Amino acid sequence: MASLAQQLAGGLRCPPLSNSNLSKPFSPKHTLKPRFSPIVSAVAVSNAQTRERQKLKQLFEDAYERCRNAPMEGVSFTIDDFHTALDKYDFNSEMGSRVKGTVFCTDANGALVDITAKSSAYLPLAEACIYRIKNVEEAGIIPGVREEFVIIGENEADDSLILSLRQIQYELAWERCRQLQAEDVVVKGKIVGANKGGVVALVEGLRGFVPFSQISSKSSAEELLEKEIPLKFVEVDEEQSRLVMSNRKAMADSQAQLGIGSVVTGTVQSLKPYGAFIDIGGINGLLHVSQISHDRVSDIATVLQPGDTLKVMILSHDRERGRVSLSTKKLEPTPGDMIRNPKLVFEKAEEMAQTFRQRIAQAEAMARADMLRFQPESGLTLSSDGILGPLTSDLPAEGLDLSVVPPAVES
C-alpha cells in the first residue's frame, strides 16, 4: 500500500462509484418554467412601444431635415427655396385686376377656377353671365373652359378669391353700345319692363330706357311687353349708367327706305281672315288677301304661315297712321304663281318690280304731257330708282298709291 506521501504526490483519486443513480447526470422529471410578475411584463411592453415611437419620430425628423436641406434628385433647389420663390411670385390679387383661369369644377351655385394661385378661386352663379341664368353651364362655363375673369372679392373663411365674368361682359356691352351710337345703327331691343315715363328695353345685355315720347306707335306699355322694337341710341353714359334710346328715330330711318314700288324682305307675323301682317324691318305691313295673288285665295293659311320669309312690294305708306300696304300679287310673273310656285315669285321679284316701275314711269310721262296742257309749270317727279313723287302739291308726299295699277299680264 502506497504511503500517504506518495498518494499526495500523485494526487488524490477517488475510487470509481458503483453503477448507481448517483453516477448518472441529474435530469429532473419536470422542467420548471420561469415565472414573471404581470407588472414586470407590462413595463417591458410599454418600454418597447416607446422605443419604437421614438425611432419612427427620429426617422421622420431625419427625412424632413433632408427635404429641407439636402437637394433632391433632379431638383436644383430646396424646400426653403421653393417657399421663397412662391412668396416672391408676382400674382396680382387686388380687387378689379384681371386674371386668366381654367374652370375645373361646377355645381349649382357656381364654379371653381384654377388661376395658378395658392388656392383655387370661386365664380358665383350671379357673376357668371350678364343675362339671368339658372346654372353656369347655360353661360358655357364647364370644366376645361379657360376665360379671363376680374377679381371682385375675397372669401375670408379660406382666403380664396371671388371672380366675375359679368363685369367684363358689362364693359364690353357698353363699348359695343358706344360703337353702335357712333355708327348711328338701328338695333332691336326687347321690351322687358315699364314705368310711368316709358319702357325698358334689353339691348346688348344692358337695360335701356325708351321714353313714351320716343315710341312711334300708339301701343301701350302692356302691349309692347316682351316684343322687339327697332331702336336708336340717344345717350350712352357708362359713368352714370344711363342708356336712353328712341324708337321714333329708328322708325324714321326705316320708313325712309320704304319707297313706293320698292321690294323688301319680310317675315309673316300673324294671319287674319282679311290678310297677313308682315314684319318689314320693325314695321308691320298688311298683305291684304286680295294682294296675295291674281288667283283667288280662299284660305290664306294654304299660302302663308307665321314665320315664313317672303319678298313683298310696297304699295302705299301712310306715315301719319304708320300703315304700310304690301303686295305679292304685283310680283307674279304669271297670274297665280304665288299659289303654285312662290319661290319663282321671290326669285323674279326685283325683275318684276323694275318692270312695274317702268310701266308706272310711262304712265307718269303720259300724265305729265296731259297736265302740261293746263299747267306748263308743273310736272311729276321720279327718283332714279323709280320712286314716284307728287304730281301736284295736292298729292301725298310719299307718292302715288300703286294698289290700283293693273297687272302686267291680264288674267
From Swiss-Prot:
Extra facts: Two different forms exist, S1 alpha and S1 beta.
Domain of life: Eukaryota
GO molecular function list: mRNA binding; structural constituent of ribosome
Organism this protein belongs to: Spinacia oleracea
Keywords of this entry: Chloroplast, Plastid, Repeat, Ribonucleoprotein, Ribosomal protein, RNA-binding, Transit peptide
Name of the protein this chain belongs to: Small ribosomal subunit protein bS1c
The family this protein is said to belong to: Belongs to the bacterial ribosomal protein bS1 family.
Primary site of residence: plastid
Quaternary structure annotation from Swiss-Prot or TrEMBL: Component of the chloroplast small ribosomal subunit (SSU). Mature 70S chloroplast ribosomes of higher plants consist of a small (30S) and a large (50S) subunit. The 30S small subunit contains 1 molecule of ribosomal RNA (16S rRNA) and 24 different proteins. The 50S large subunit contains 3 rRNA molecules (23S, 5S and 4.5S rRNA) and 33 different proteins.
Key word Transit peptide present: yes
Function description: Component of the chloroplast ribosome (chloro-ribosome), a dedicated translation machinery responsible for the synthesis of chloroplast genome-encoded proteins, including proteins of the transcription and translation machinery and components of the photosynthetic apparatus. Actively engaged in the initiation complex formation via a strong mRNA-binding activity. Possesses a poly(A)-binding activity which might play a role as a control element in chloroplast mRNA translation.
Regions crossing the membrane: none
Record-linked InterPro entries: NA-bd_OB-fold (IPR012340), Ribos_protein_bS1-like (IPR050437), Ribosomal_protein_S1-like (IPR035104), S1_domain (IPR003029)
One GO term (biological process): translation
Transit peptide: 1-41
GO cellular component: chloroplast stroma; ribonucleoprotein complex; ribosome
